[in-house]
Amino acid sequence: MSSGRIVQIIGAVIDVEFPRDSVPSIYNALKVQGAETTLEVQQQLGDGVVRTIAMGSTEGLKRGLDVVDTGAAISVPVGKATLGRIMDVLGNPIDEAGPIDTEERWGIHRPAPSFAEQAGGNDLLETGIKVIDLVCPFAKGGKVGLFGGAGVGKTVNMMELIRNIAIEHSGYSVFAGVGERTREGNDFYHEMKDSNVLDKVALVYGQMNEPPGNRLRVALTGLTMAEKFRDEGNDVLLFVDNIYRYTLAGTEVSALLGRMPSAVGYQPTLAEEMGVLQERITSTKEGSITSIQAVYVPADDLTDPSPATTFAHLDATVVLSRDIASLGIYPAVDPLDSTSRQLDPNVIGQEHYDTARGVQYVLQRYKELKDIIAILGMDELSETDKQLVSRARKIQRFLSQPFFVAEVFTGASGKYVSLKDTIAGFKGILNGDYDHLPEQAFYMVGGIEEAIEKAKKL
């Protein structure tokens, strides 16, 4: 246990001088004496000086304070004791429910599983959300990104997915709140409590008001807990909200560490940092990690380096669109922009594949005809195009669905729609079985039976 002293403080970055024969290794955790602060070594500057990031507030720290090297990376509690608890980046409980009852702790920096250890699978994960199950189905053990700008419904979609999957799936879940609003973390906790699934979820929060060190490492803390469950042979769900804030924290830290910024001011190590995190989120022969990540898209620009880097790692992408949200269609998933590796007739079956592609064709054609309709009106279209437009508008409305987690806002009770019912409903619309129903009947309903009932009342 070598000790050193603080020689410089720049915001969240602190330089510590050690004797030259006992300089701590990269990623070692250091403890500041007389303060609660933990530091993580990022660079060795030479002459016994290391540059560190503070995992917590740097208020009250000053030059000359003693710092002790713990000789290991930051470690966090893992295992069943973490379920139902809220923890911070260091694994300390922040829910005022006493200490976490476990001896076992794992370091947050771990190697990704080797190629030989990894296992792939084609099992589908049913979410009960029509548009997702139809157009961008999730794979069990896959990675999913929810992309969207500010206020189009990433977190609400995420909470609905957690609710549906946690209740239907009955496995363990880990939720990492990375740089999001504390209010959302609070809502989320109560939502889990009310749904009686809190005893299956471990919650790790590093919210918006935390220093960049916490926001940078909290995703790794959550991932480490998920890896422990996976290695015990479980199928785990890992939810990260929001992966963009992880990148942003890296940007803040990178500038303070004195690295030269790259495109749009991001850190030069953006792709590597993202890779280190994403490569660990994988399924092995022991168990699987299915991860669902919300990705904030700055200024609705999907070509921004941060979302663009994230795209490369995902199996399915759910793109939320402001244009669709402005039509009042929620979830505001863009069925033409969202994709999945699972959308393959050999994986999901021919019927599902044909229905999904049929829906996309009709919506794409409607999009092309919109300009003609805007200039010349519906009357100038051929009969087949008129029919197609009518079906497209029904499909568009049928892609909406009331959510359980939004019941308090909308007053409409949530709906879980099985994959079988989803395919049957859209197939019927494509085949013209419901051409006689008004399009309002398809808005904000669950299965097609409900639309038929609703039409009778209109």
Curated annotation (Swiss-Prot):
It is a peripheral membrane protein. The keyword Mitochondrion does not apply. One of its GO terms (cellular component) is proton-transporting ATP synthase complex. It is found in: Cell inner membrane. ATP binds at G148, G149, A150, G151, V152, G153, K154, T155. Keywords: ATP synthesis, ATP-binding, Cell inner membrane, Cell membrane, CF(1), Hydrogen ion transport, Ion transport, Membrane, Nucleotide-binding, Translocase, Transport. It is an enzyme of class 7 (translocase). The keyword Lipid metabolism does not apply. It comes from the Bacteria. Belongs to the ATPase alpha/beta chains family. Produces ATP from ADP in the presence of a proton gradient across the membrane. The catalytic sites are hosted primarily by the beta subunits. This is ATP synthase subunit beta. It comes from Pseudomonas fluorescens (strain SBW25). The gene is atpD.
